[in-house]
From Swiss-Prot:
It is found in: Mitochondrion matrix. One of its GO terms (cellular component) is mitochondrial matrix. Coiled coil: none annotated. Residues 1-31 form a transit peptide. Its main location: mitochondrion. The keyword Ligase does not apply. One of its GO terms (molecular function) is metal ion binding. The active site is at residues 143, 214. This is NAD-dependent malic enzyme, mitochondrial. (S)-malate binds at residues 196, 464, 509. It catalyses: (S)-malate + NAD(+) = pyruvate + CO2 + NADH.
Length: 623
């Protein structure tokens, strides 16, 4: 009894002392927030704390913590450092490399994902420390492209719940369901309906894998606290016949809802999450084309929400397009002079088109005539060929980019002209692929691009996953020439051109932008997420590279610099939110104080609000 009383007094005393320290810090004006004070009061101990990945430290629990949390004797006696834990984990991966290095790459990547996922399930702090320190190697494992394979095999890989599932069977219950999530505060939600997963089609409930992977990158790149992120799957059924017939499928085995029924489910979900967490940011992920733009327009002026496939992909593409202008030795202001042939008119293609047109128009004066002049710089080709006003049942979103027949005939083209014909006649500066059709940029198309009027034509093969890329970098450099600028949506290795020359592969991953967009919106307290924020973010990314890097064909920076890139992008978003009078501030930084910050102070503010994977001091307090 004496020992128990003594422990109780010790714990209570420690809680009071730590609370006093935080109160003292709060009384002094500082950019620091709770992200900088790694204290966590927990309501569990003993085996319960070891089963909680948010707080479990494994062998790194100190002896005093083991006493406070009733862990003494439940762990091996040697208290390990973080570095030692990473060394043990890395050793497991190196064994995997030795045993699978000669096997198929998919098998090896999936095996790495399994090992990382097991770490994620038992110790989130260690998982994110490993991910951040090896971001170039592991980002393609936790997200694109390996996550596509994970989603395809999800029913067999599922072991432990992560995130939340809202289904059409839950209609009328979602407002209460959101309170089943244990976190009192959620800053970021990534939600998918599984209808269009990475160009793999309708994967139903398996699609939650992309939401999980995307949030892993938010934490690693933007420093969003992992305890305040929530992956969500909206299961409204599936039209995938294989899943409907599979007795082991984990989702609803009925046809996908459509029309007003679908919208009713989405409306109820959005109302529920914003009722519990009014300041949360919701990012839509891998929603089929027919709904992606509809949902974005439906919610964007009411909630803090965006669609990474439409706006994120377009922002990264704009940054790359501006970088391609720089690679020609020209200033970015010359962007409106670029001739761009676009292959693909889905949600991603339309998003890029609209963003590029707005960027050009802004450079041309931002009036009605500027938008009209900008439109004439694009030639859009889909699976039926060149799009003109003669096209029947034309999507309203694509209508502004449809050429008039009398105008296009003067160029020797007509409705439905094949991609190779368009490239031959237009001689574009940029060939932009957003078609999700692997190999679309055939040898014939690439040879036609050799006649481009540009001194340095650019190829953007942006479709994911890797097999859907419109062409490989080897094909681009070998057919078009060493001078071409090449960007892709999935990772490829640089190409050895011989004579000591390297053909740089620029992965136009939307990872360059979406973490900074989310972080900037969060820290600015912006009421909504505007198109201008994406434009500001894209321009900041385009200007991130040095002149020397750009002249060498490098238009996107190394992913190893992603946290620094994210800070820069977030700063651009915060400044834009302030300029548009949308910023309301965050925590103890109100809107008026935010307006007073210069560039250096904004970056400092961002840095001090980014979560870092360091073990907090854990203190037990009974509920």
């Amino acid at each position: 009894m004496l020992v128990l009383c003594s422990r109780s007094r010790l714990t209570s005393s420690l809680i009071r002392r730590l609370k006093d320290q935080i109160a003292n810090v709060s009384n002094h004006r500082s950019f620091a927030t709770s992200e900088g004070h790694r204290l966590a009061i927990v309501n569990k101990r003993s085996l319960d704390i070891l089963q909680d990945p948010w707080f479990n430290k494994g062998t790194a629990f100190s002896m005093t913590e083991r006493d406070r949390l009733d862990l003494r004797g439940l762990l091996p006696p040697n208290v390990m450092t973080t570095e030692q834990q990473i060394e043990r984990f890395t050793a497991d991966l190196r064994v995997l490399e030795l045993t699978t290095k000669d096997g198929p790459s998919d098998t090896y990547d999936l095996a790495k994902w399994r090992i990382l996922n097991r770490l994620h399930d038992r110790n989130e702090t260690m998982f994110f420390k490993v991910l951040i320190e090896n971001i170039e190697e592991y980002a393609p494992i936790v997200s694109t492209p390996t996550v596509g394979l994970v989603c395809q095999k999800f029913s067999g890989l599922y072991r432990r719940p992560r995130g939340m599932y809202f289904s059409s069977d839950d209609r009328g219950e979602m407002m209460s369901m959101v309170y089943n999530w244990p976190a009192e505060q959620v800053d970021m939600i990534v939600v998918t309906d599984g209808s269009r997963i990475l160009g793999l089609g309708d994967l139903g409930v398996h699609g939650i894998g992309v939401a999980i992977g995307k949030l892993d990158l938010y934490v690693a790149a933007a420093g969003i606290n992992p305890q305040r992120v929530l992956p969500v799957m909206i299961d409204v059924g599936t039209n995938n016949e294989d899943l409907l017939k599979n007795p082991l499928y984990l989702g609803l085995q009925k046809k996908r809802l459509d029309g007003e029924e679908y919208l009713a489910v989405m409306d109820e979900f959005m109302e529920a999450v914003f009722t519990r967490w009014p300041n949360v940011i919701v990012q839509f992920e891998d929603i089929q084309n027919k709904w992606a733009l509809t949902l974005l327009q439906r919610y964007r002026h009411k909630y803090r929400t965006f669609n990474v496939d439409v706006q994120g992909t377009s922002g990264v593409a704009i940054a790359g397009l501006l970088g391609a202008v720089r690679a020609q030795g020209r200033p970015m202001i010359d962007f409106p002079k670029q001739k761009i042939v676009v292959a693909g008119a889905g949600s991603s293609g339309v998003g890029v088109l609209n963003a590029a047109r707005k960027t050009m128009a802004r450079m041309l004066g931002n009036d009605e005539s500027a938008f009209d002049r900008a439109r004439s710089q694009f030639w859009v080709v889909d699976d039926k060929g060149l799009i003109t006003e003669k096209r029947a049942n034309l999507d309203p979103e694509v209508q502004p980019f449809a050429w008039k027949e009398n105008e296009i005939s003067l160029q020797g083209l007509n409705e439905g002209a094949k991609l190779v014909e368009v490239v031959r006649q237009v001689k574009p500066d940029v060939l932009l692929g957003l078609s999700a059709y692997g190999g679309l940029f055939s040898k014939e198309v690439l040879e036609a691009l050799k006649d481009s009027t540009s001194t340095r034509p650019a190829i953007f093969a942006m479709s994911n996953p890797t097999k859907n890329a419109e062409c490989t970098p080897e094909e681009a450099f070998s057919i078009v020439g060493d001078h071409v600028v090449y960007a892709s949506g999935s990772p490829f290795k640089d190409v050895d051109l011989g004579n000591g020359k390297i053909g740089h592969v620029n992965q136009g991953n939307n990872m360059y932008l979406f973490p900074g967009i989310g972080l900037g919106v969060l820290l600015s307290g912006s009421r909504i997420i505007s198109d201008s924020m994406f434009q500001a973010a894209a321009e900041r990314l385009a200007g991130y590279m040095t002149d020397e890097e750009v002249i060498n064909g490098v238009i996107y920076p190394s992913i190893s610099r992603i946290r620094d890139i994210t800070k820069e992008v977030a700063a651009a978003v915060i400044k834009e939110a302030v300029e548009e009078d949308l910023a309301e501030g965050y925590r103890d930084m109100d809107a008026r104080e935010l307006q007073k910050l210069n560039e250096e102070q904004i970056l400092e503010y961002i840095e001090k609000n980014m979560w870092n994977p360091e073990y907090p001091t854990l203190v037990y307090k009974k509920r």
